[in-house]
Amino acid sequence: MNTLLVGINVAVMLILVGVLYYMQRKHVSFNKRVFTALGVGIIFGLILQFIYEPTSKVIIESNTWFGLIGSGYVKLLQMIVMPLILVSIISAFTKLQLTKNLGKISGLIIGILILTTGIAAAVGIAASAGFDVSATGLQQGDAESARLKLVEERFTSIEKTTIPDKLLELLPTNPFLDLTGARPTSTISVVIFAAFIGIAFIGVKRKYPEQAELFKKMLDAVYAIVMRMVTLILRLTPYGVLALMAKTVAGSDINAILKLGNFVLASYVALIVMFVIHLLLIALSGLNPIQYLKKVFPVLTFAFTSRSSAGAMPLNIEAQKEKLGISEGIANFAASFGVSIGQNGCAGIYPAMLAMMVAPTVGIDPLQPQFILTLIAVVAISSFGVAGVGGGATFAALIVLSTMNLPIGIVALVISVEPLIDMGRTALNVSGSMTAGLISSKWLGELDQDTYNQDDTKTGEIAS
């Protein structure tokens, strides 16, 4: 019986995929197809929730099949991330886009990411205080106990890693290993390796222009092929969003969400407020924030449904270059750094809120100005340190809580709502990296404002 029900669910999913394909054949805009996929995925997931239990075998097996589309799409994006970063950054050097301002570009992007993370921490603190979020009364079940054990094991290894060791982890001792994404710091390591190749190219160009020109032509050919691969994968975005959204909603435990409803609500209020701050920063830079919102919507939608900042990188880079008019070098640096450094959602809002929740349990008044200022500073600085250990929100929270001498057990107690909150956090992370790239490009005078201000026509190219 279960097999029949699973078959029906999969058949419905395939029909919905067929509808999206029909929309593509009718040349419905890319944005509309992504938005349709998001809405239909939510509705389909809710229907499955209503018919079955989230933990039922039917839902579990159906989600496994849905994963062929959703997780398959994410894996394709992850496949292209490293080649895209490597080729794009080297290409930026060969096109003389990163010859003079390399240090200024890197410093400005990282500075904006860390600054906005500090602001995000303040927003998280305000949301926690406003909604009176507290760890008191949270119960530890079997799932939470298992998660706590894993958290404590991981924390032990993080605690032993010194700051110099974290910084050394960023260097690519084996670039071919990092191209496989084997280490938490692989993304930044590939950026550094690509920058070294680019700098070497500039030196070779001065002494041996013929060899440099040959390398440039070869790289241009590889770049064209990689970008064609990116375009082919991006066309699958609506199908990936549909499957990921249906899978997430169908498998969510509504009862657990309701128990931690106050925390979930406070988290999303903080995420929305921080996103509005991104728009305000863009407006203060002399750019139209509505134009930004319209052009990055598909990227944020995918980040929301996939919960993968790294998986969203190809869309992130494509949107920055082709839609926002950001120069190639800045777009690649902003997207790459944003995966590991200064994540507004995972390393900003989330750790700050957990610290505010757990502080009263050890006799600390979380509303004391000294505690708040210290927490904001620790969150901002730690958001850079996370780059050396990886692990996203969980380990960002571990670093902050341990630095503040607070219990780390709270990280395990919110496991039941982790997927739901992580969706919003990831979207904010990606928005933060694009905001950093946009503002940096504007301040350095490298923004193509004609591209930024024109109507979005690039989505049509992806669709064709």
Curated annotation (Swiss-Prot):
Q: Name one GO molecular function term.
A: L-cystine transmembrane transporter activity
Cross-referenced Pfam families: SDF
Q: List the disulfide bonds.
A: none
Q: Where in the cell is it found?
A: Membrane
* InterPro entries cross-referenced by the UniProt entry: Na-dicarboxylate_symporter, Na:dicarbo_symporter_sf
Q: Which residues cross the membrane?
A: 3-23, 34-54, 73-93, 107-127, 184-204, 225-245, 263-283, 347-367, 371-391, 395-415
Q: Which domain of life is it from?
A: Bacteria
For this UniProt entry, what's an example GO CC term?
plasma membrane
* Protein family according to the UniProt entry: Belongs to the dicarboxylate/amino acid:cation symporter (DAACS) (TC 2.A.23) family.
Know the name of this protein?
A: L-cystine uptake protein TcyP
